[in-house]
A protein has these predicted regions:
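Alpha-helical scaffold segments
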Residues: 1-124
Length: 124
């Protein structure tokens, strides 16, 4: 079921926080997602940075300003969000500077500072 949902929508349900507390659990969430009941799943998607980023990229296909501080707390999510939604080119130094500047501004709105540790992307 999760593989089918990922293929159909681009949403990885493993990234959704507290999915067991959703009415109907994971099955109910997947069913509502496939039935395009976005008003029901949006609060659940807003709980974590990865799910917020995926919701903005694959469902809204636009900026989600209310969730940008949550997304900005997670380096990988912000990198993908800024590339797809904000249009930064993360392959160039100028693009990365633009991405980090935008992230810094978003974090400032919630009273956080962008630290070197927060910038560090995992090395796979």
């Amino acid at each position: 079921m999760t593989k089918y949902v990922l293929d159909e929508t681009g949403i990885n349900v493993k990234h959704v926080k507290k999915i067991k507390s959703y009415p109907g659990g994971m099955e109910g969430f997947c069913k509502d997602l496939l039935d395009k009941k976005y008003d029901l799943i949006e609060p659940q998607m807003a709980l974590g940075p990865r799910s917020s980023q995926e919701y903005a990229m694959y469902i809204k296909k636009a900026r989600w300003p209310e969730q940008e501080p949550v997304i900005a707390n997670h380096a990988v999510s912000w990198t993908m969000y800024s590339r797809e939604i904000l249009g930064t080119n993360n392959m160039t130094k100028a693009g990365r500077l633009q991405r980090d500047k935008m992230r810094k501004e978003v974090l400032k709105t919630v009273g956080l500072k962008l630290t070197a540790k927060m910038k560090k992307l995992p090395s796979w």
